[in-house]
Every structure is written in structure tokens, then in C-alpha cells.
Amino acid sequence: MAKEDVIEMQGTVQDTLPNTMFRVELENGHVVTAHISGKMRKNYIRILTGDKVTVELTPYDLSKGRIVFRAR
């Protein structure tokens, strides 16, 4: 997926799901299922319920995303 094709949005982690998946509520109110990006997994960045995150969405499926950043 090319970098230009992604939609970046801010959201809050609502729930933790199995296999490092998370339910994230975006700023616009939509709820998506997101997984952790490879760099976050490699650097052991922990994500907890209530964390503010940046999610990349593909224009082809707006119900799934990738967490690329966790705000402090």
C-alpha cells in the first residue's frame, strides 16, 4: 500500500481484542478494528485502553486500520 493512499485519523482505544487487535473510536465517532504496526511491535510499545492513537485507514476498507503512533 503506497503511503499516499492511506487516511490518517486520531482516535481513542476503546477495547483490547485477541491477537493484538484493538477497537478504536475515531474522532468522527466511527469505530474501527485496528492492529499494531510492525515498528511498534518491534519496539515493544504497549497500548492500553484509553490511549490516544493515530490510525492509518485504507480507502478500500474503512472498518479496519493500523495503529502507527501512540500519544503520551
Curated annotation (Swiss-Prot):
The keyword Protein biosynthesis applies. InterPro entries: NA-bd_OB-fold, RNA-binding_domain_S1_IF1, S1_domain, TIF_IF1. It comes from Photobacterium profundum (strain SS9). Keywords: Cytoplasm, Initiation factor, Protein biosynthesis, RNA-binding, rRNA-binding. Its main location: cytoplasm. Residues 1-72 form the S1-like domain. The gene is infA. It is found in: Cytoplasm. This is Translation initiation factor IF-1.
